[in-house]
Design a protein with these regions (language model features):
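Generic N-terminal amphipathic, Lys/Arg-enriched alpha-helix
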Residues: 1-14
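Short glycine-rich anion-binding loops that position phosphate/pyrophosphate groups of nucleotides
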Residues: 14, 77-79, 102
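Short, charged/polar "capping" segments at the starts of alpha-helices
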Residues: 17-18, 43-49
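Short glycine/serine/threonine-rich phosphate/pyrophosphate-binding segments
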Residues: 18-19, 78-84
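Short internal beta-strands
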Residues: 33-42
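Short acidic low-complexity segments
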Residues: 54-68
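Short, acidic/small-residue loops that bind anionic groups at enzyme active sites
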Residues: 90-108
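Catalytic core of DAGKc-family lipid kinases
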Residues: 102-149
């Protein structure tokens, strides 16, 4: 029997109205036999919005280190960049699900989440390699690192 795919999910500073969408995407993953693995910061956002993480969804501090097969970045293009920063050099593929208005990097809309989940489950996807640049400097606030694709 094949191993169950573990799909990491990450979102940053999501609008309260988007939180139920995250729960629906997790439910679709579970229905399709995948294991959603949610970043603890996203789980905290869900709890603050009164949307609990359902049984069958794992909560971890760093999904990139939790045996993840693929990441779903839930939000917009900024969230994809944040997700890529979290995955680092792991090589874990990232798929953006756009929960906002406009997305160039996260072009899959919430309405397409089920089709995306089924495609991932069935291996019907291709990985596009992207270059990643990082900017570090002494003038950046709090010593942060800026990244871009």
């Amino acid at each position: 029997m094949a191993n169950t795919m573990r799909i990491g999910t990450h979102g940053r500073s999501l609008a309260r109205a988007s939180i139920p969408s995250v729960a629906r995407i997790h439910a679709l993953m579970r229905i399709e036999g995948l294991v959603p693995v949610v970043d603890s910061s996203l789980a905290a956002q869900m709890a603050m919005a009164g949307v609990p993480v359902e049984p069958g969804t794992e909560v971890v501090d760093n999904p990139a280190l939790a045996g993840i097969d693929l990441f779903f970045s839930l939000g917009g293009d900024g969230t994809i960049l944040d997700t890529v920063a979290k995955t680092g050099q792991s090589g874990i593929p990232v798929l953006g699900i756009n929960l906002g208005r406009l997305g160039f990097l996260s072009s899959t809309r919430e309405e397409g989440a089920l089709a995306a989940i089924q495609a991932v489950k069935e291996g019907r996807y291709t990985i596009q390699e992207r270059s990643l640049i990082a900017l570090q400097g002494t003038d950046l606030a709090n010593g942060e690192t800026l990244i871009g694709l």
